[in-house]
Curated annotation (Swiss-Prot):
GO cellular component: chromosome, telomeric region; nucleosome; nucleus
Any one of the GO BP annotations: DNA damage checkpoint signaling
GO molecular function: histone binding; histone H3K79 methyltransferase activity; histone H3K79 trimethyltransferase activity
Protein name in UniProt: Histone-lysine N-methyltransferase, H3 lysine-79 specific
EC number(s) per entry: 2.1.1.360
Main location class: nucleus
UniProt source species: Yarrowia lipolytica (strain CLIB 122 / E 150)
Regulation: Ubiquitination of histone H2B to form H2BK123ub1 is required for efficient DOT1 methyltransferase activity on histone H3.
Amino acid sequence: MFFSHLGKKNGGPTAKSSDVKRKVTKVKTRKPVVTSVSKSPSPSKTAPPPATAAAAATAAAKPSTPRKSRRKTPNIYQLSKSSLSEVDTEESEREVSSSLSTPGLYELVPRDIVTAGFGSAELATSIHITNASESGNLSMTDIYEPVSTDKSLSDRVKLGALSCDFVEDYSLIKPKVPGEFEPVREILSIMEMTALHFVDKGASEEIKHPVMDDCIMRRFRRSYEGGDLEGMKTSMKEFDEVVKTQRAEGAILANLKQLTAVPQDLAYFLLNQVYSRIVSPESKSLRDYKAFSNNVYGELMPPFMSTVFQKTDLQPSSVFVDLGSGVGNCTLQAALEVGCESWGCEVMTNASSLAEKQKIELYSRAKMFGIKTGDIHLVASSFVHNDEVHSAISRADVLLVNNYAFDGTLNAHLLDMFLDLKEGCKIVSLKSFVPVGHVISEHNIESPVNILKVQKLDFYSGSVSWTAAGGTYYISTVDRSAIKAFLSKGGY
């Protein structure tokens, strides 16, 4: 249900593997998975290597077995929006398990991700969240219905955090309307994340068996499908006991320390948790803007931003700045996924207010999983003539400007700001700041665009909130060598 309340297409992008592969250390993670999943081949390597004569003879000798048709399963980002009823068979349950058990194919930046005070009482008291039982429209009977027809049973349950003795309240109810927050789906995802990344193999298989034989997730799902509220509660208690035991034995902390980055499926899940509680219930307020103005609201989706981080080589030591940051999605994602110092500036009051709430929610939810983020700084004002923003962009390694709807005046002001960017800073935008065919000459020698070296790239379906279609974006690198060379030759 990520961002679905804005009425936009929510599917993840169909990206080429060659466009999203980062050339740095791959995140280390234990994978209690028996199903192998191969990376998609790059466009230049789609043909398989020719079989040897021996291999061909062996293949010919084996009887042909028809392959079982399997529908394509969604990743964690897509699954968070799908209805439980769409994946309620045992076969599809195994497929969903397989897809969720495979970490994203991106290679993530290595860093220490463990939060301070793991397992302590102080960590638990520092967590302040919007409980799942308070999210969205859960109290509206025209949108939600009980799991069980027995009205004497309470649908309230508590689910413990992985890192400390903090619990979150949930209501075990189901939505009647597609796209609404699904508490049961979220609980299943938490179980999945736990089994994949945080516990030892035995505990992992107890929570989610690799081929979905009898396990906690399977029993929980079956109880849900059968309207057995008490059965669901029993499964949740079993899950909590596994988590408490693993934390007490030091297994969760040990497994966290093995991770060299926040797994991408977990990062998207946390962002979705935060968004569904803070932004989704208030999404109507984001439509209150003047059409075709500089304040038109639109969102860049998480998979697209992951690609941007990789293309710009954003590192934990980097500084990321988003000018026109809206509700803070990109700013929060950079701090969580990469772990860098992350800045956002937004002039719209309603959007900047939600951004601040999302920041607080993300800090706490990351702590619940034992994860630390990079520092997040949000400025609720215009970035024009703003000293705090100016100081941040002068240190920026990556500057994001969603200038899709900016007018010429604001784009011109941005260009003037770019003069203070450091050499090598990368500017990501949806419109190029450098005119097509631009050549340095004595007539434009003072133009700020002379310090930019621009690269045009494609984004894929589902990358932005305002259209389902793909499009283009630009990465401009601050490179003063061309203008220096021009001036060294006397300006000719």
